[in-house]
Amino acid sequence: MALRRPMVAGNWKMNGSAALAQELFKKFASKLQNDSAEVVLCPPSIYLESVRQLLEANKEALDGSLVRMGAQNLSQHDFGAYTGEVSGQMLKDCGCRYVIIGHSERRRMYGETSNIVAEKFAAAQKHGLTPILCVGESGPAREARRTFEVIAEELDIVIQKNGTMAFDNAIIAYEPLWAVGTGKSATPEQAQEVHAFIRKRLSEVSPFIGENIRILYGGSVTPSNAADLFAQPDVDGGLIGGASLNSTEFLSLCTIAMSA
């Protein structure tokens, strides 16, 4: 069985501040002292440089731990007249290692189709970034027993446009839309069922990818439910929203992942 290092990725969305970043790093420096889990901070783009500077300033204190920086979105284009957009190369220049692709809020609020998501996935990898690909079903889709169908479609478009081996450098985050930002989390059993399906789906085209890819759960993860979620055999950590804005809760989630 593959040894997949757990990951806790904090998606601040359009929240947070430079002060929050400083508070997080102060706690990281004193309490985050091993590399059994990878921690990724995904602040708004305006704060990427602040986080990069904090990573550099705390390099010695964080020695032995794995704290990385990621972005919440990128353009599928390399450059051009795309006002307000940020390219993969720009994120790489800022020090990002990861970028969230296809978050449900981007799909729903900004009309990002699965084809656009697949293009952004490719753009991230072109510039040396690891995409964190979000997939998940709506409440009505789950009630209609279409969860697997929806997720298969979202995965298959990325595979068709980028090839199976593109997932050798990717993370998948399962985020049921009915749980994102609602305070209602999937049960550990529900999460495991979907994660196992995703792993099996990828294993059908590449056993190596299926066994080794990390699959995160995202959807109202808190310190009270994280241990049970992270204990599931196919759950490799979490994509954290609201709890990532509370330094105490986020550090608790990191600690739970380290012992998962």
UniProtKB/Swiss-Prot annotation:
GO biological process: gluconeogenesis; glyceraldehyde-3-phosphate biosynthetic process; glycerol catabolic process; glycolytic process
Pfam families: TIM (PF00121)
Protein's pathway: Carbohydrate biosynthesis; gluconeogenesis; Carbohydrate degradation; glycolysis; D-glyceraldehyde 3-phosphate from glycerone phosphate: step 1/1
SUPFAM superfamilies noted in UniProt: Triosephosphate isomerase (TIM)
Entry annotated with the keyword Isomerase: yes
Enzyme class: isomerase
Main localization category: cytoplasm
Gene Ontology MF terms in the entry: triose-phosphate isomerase activity
Domain of life from the UniProt record: Bacteria
Binding site for substrate: 11-13, 181, 220, 241-242
Annotated compartments: Cytoplasm
Recorded catalytic activity of this chain's protein: D-glyceraldehyde 3-phosphate = dihydroxyacetone phosphate
Active-site residues (renumbered): 103 (electrophile), 175 (proton acceptor)
InterPro entries: Aldolase_TIM, TIM_sf, TrioseP_Isoase_bac/euk, Triosephosphate_isomerase, Triosephosphate_isomerase_AS
Keyword terms: Cytoplasm, Gluconeogenesis, Glycolysis, Isomerase
Cellular component aspect of the GO annotation: cytosol
Documented EC number(s): 5.3.1.1
Subunit structure: Homodimer.
Family: Belongs to the triosephosphate isomerase family.
Function summary: Involved in the gluconeogenesis. Catalyzes stereospecifically the conversion of dihydroxyacetone phosphate (DHAP) to D-glyceraldehyde-3-phosphate (G3P).
Protein name: Triosephosphate isomerase
GN (gene name): tpiA
